[in-house]
């Protein structure tokens, strides 16, 4: 549209989206102006563009334009100025005497070097006003100031300094984009690096074909063209007829790298970038030529590049892919490796044969076969959008993998299979640990429900519980000491009856499993209860008679010293059958063989002292009360209860006595191995149980008289029994935890809890009050200790 842009093909000075596009270059004309790229002026046309005048024609054809005086090479205008006024960015405005000759050059690459070797002052990489830290806006390159972090004067605000001056992170995506910063040919790397969009096509073709073939490229050279209007004709012909690309000799390459001393400093920095952008074949040929030859070579190279670009447009337009698509696959730094230095590598022969460019292997599947990519990259946001889309595609793929692997919690980009497996194992381990913790918590909650043991989470809670236990134990002991003789006898008898009722639920299943007809016999006492009631009455009366017989031969004593041993008491009397005393208890019962022995012992013990303390002694028969209480609960017709078994008795001894029994269970009265034992004898039939009960009158086991009674059912105590079981369990489980603090009081607490089971239940509200009173006493102590531990801990860490 107007101005002759070698690659634009319309677009009115804009880089034209590759053949009549909307005026925006897909690779670097992002801001709308190719501005200074390949020597074009900031206005969007090439500033004379090889001699064209500002109106878009070749204005003097290499220097014949109004502003393009060929000058004398010393007078401020480049002798090969190519028109456009002040070289129009073609190698910098005010070439300034060409390498320091003019006052502006100043010999120090100073004021108006004016984009020398790099286009207009806006062109990043020119060595003029904003170039290489010698201008106003150059960043950190060679002491420059202002905004360019990498410096080199390669644009106003680009972090890498690769061209455009509009905040482009990659350079070459902003306005006045120059892919190769610091090159002497407008916006090309090292004067030869940047090849605009046609070069982009070559970037796809050349390296990939080289990888495919693995053969060196054929080298072609082109004779130097004259500075006449032939350039215009050549370029016009090249639009119609593709010509083979041509290259200069190796000596031209060497002279470009070995410039004057001042130029070498600038070139070194440019070479550092060009080395990062593309691997180059370094050749050392020590040849120095005139500066005019260098300019001629540059012009020839630019002509060749333009011709190659035009040929590439005709050849590879249908299948061309923009580097932006490729660059979206890579990071910002990785795209530098995809640039191709066409001046260092010969053009492949396949280009002449019009072979289609090899598409990018990673992205071929994303474009349909018949689709021609129409891309419009205005700025970096387009490229970033593509990168975001690729990241989203990767996320979607990983989310699909997550569906196959439910243990994975969050998508992770670019995660290997080993990492995924590792994450799954960790997650599964975490889930297993969580399940184990939940099971442990459930078990603990069940234990708490059964035992009602409060959780001890801190030292304060432990102290509170200790105080509560001691208060309960002391209350039980006080109540025991204040009891009368009658109450103590009732407690003992009730303990026996309670133990008679134990394990009955476990006995019933065993009986039903072993004998099929037993179930009916068990039901008969409740259904047809005539004989059972008559038997029950006789049983109760028989049990009462046996108790009276036992009590007539027994003495009740109390106020026994806790440290006194049983032998100290039994050694004072004769005819003793058994001494029933709980460990370290201050009371007990002496059972004698005959009533006469009991009376003699009463006289002796009432006058005796144990460890300096007198005993309280009395008969049990006259003190026995409420015989009806023993007949309130229904009996178990299949089970007998035996009390006061000697410590040496075992299951074999009882089995020899009760041969018709089906199950024998021996219990220790107070949980101590050497204490008096109690047993439950289960029979298969009611007749067997009745026969065993009848024969057990005056029964001796290991030469000790024992009491034999019927066991009782638990039906009437279903609601009361759990409370009794819960109270001792609370105290017994907490006492071992306190053992480290008060080992001497353990036995006392256990004994007192067993002795006063019913009293503790009745006085539970009182115990709660005691616990509440103890709390304010224990809390201040714990609060005083905690700060001390913290202070010492901090000191140790410091």
From Swiss-Prot:
Subcellular location: Nucleus, Nucleolus
Gene Ontology CC: nucleolus
Compositionally biased spans, kind Basic residues: 783-798
Biased composition (Low complexity): 467-476
Biased composition (Acidic residues): 196-205, 226-242, 258-278, 287-317, 378-404, 424-450, 478-504, 743-762
Polar residues biased stretches: 328-350
GO terms of molecular function: RNA binding
Basic and acidic residues bias locations: 59-75, 88-98, 106-116, 532-548
The entry's keywords: Nucleus, RNA-binding
Domain notes: Arginine-glycine RGG-box region plays a role in sub-nucleolar compartmentalization. Dispensable for nucleolar accumulation.
Protein name in UniProt: Nucleolin homolog 1
Species lineage: Eukaryota, Metazoa, Ecdysozoa, Nematoda, Chromadorea
